[in-house]
Amino acid sequence: MPRCTVTLSANAGAVLELNLVRIWLDLLHTQKTENFSTVGPELQRRMLQCEAFAHPDLIFFTHCHPDHYSRTLTGQALKLWPDAKLVLPQQEFARQITLSRPVERLDLPGCSVRFGRLPHEGAQYAGVPHYGCVIEAGGFTALIAGDCEVASPLLAQLIGDTPIDLALLDFPWVTLRPGGAFLER
């Protein structure tokens, strides 16, 4: 039976543990934005003491906006866990996987991740490199949409016919009619 644990941090940050694979999602950020929390010094200290936030296999950022990504905290994490794979949609570190194609795949022991380029919500962010992913491990499938435009056809293409067991989505997916209709399909 597949085992999945989700541990939330601040804003869109989460740790997804599927079987024995630990994936950090938009977890490290320090810039506070209006109405959203961030990873301040106290939360950073508590995260370092919590097993759920230790030893990531994969560190993935959907995009590099400062409310989702901190280069400084990411660099610190890579020093603590040098074996972690880092995946970003733009070049930030010498040792990283840079997403650039419409769809890309990464295989880890016991887990596969299919990344897809998705439009960021809001016309003002049309040029922002932004990716979501479908994570499959041990018969369990999770969807990470980041700040994807609600009801995006590109997200539907990324999912295809794959049954989704868990979807981590921004609140407009539930509160706005197009998001709810998309989820029902």
What are these regions (language model features)?
Residues M1, E17, E51-H55, K79-P82, ...:
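Flexible, charged surface loops at secondary-structure boundaries
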Residues M1-Q49, G127-G146, L166:
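Conserved beta-strand hairpin/beta-sheet module of binuclear metal-dependent hydrolase folds
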Residues A12-V15, R105-I164:
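Catalytic core of the metallo-beta-lactamase
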Residues V21-F60, T72-Q76, V150-D161:
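Pre-active-site segment of Zn-dependent metallo-hydrolases
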Residues L27-T30, C64, L118-P119, A145-C148, ...:
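Active-site metal-binding loops of divalent metal-dependent hydrolases
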Residues E34-F36, A94-T98, L108-C111, Q124-Y125, ...:
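Short, charged, surface-exposed secondary-structure boundary motifs
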Residues R46-L106:
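Active-site HxH/HxHxD metal-binding segment of metal-dependent hydrolases
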Residues S152-R185:
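Cap/insert and terminal regions of metallo-dependent hydrolase folds
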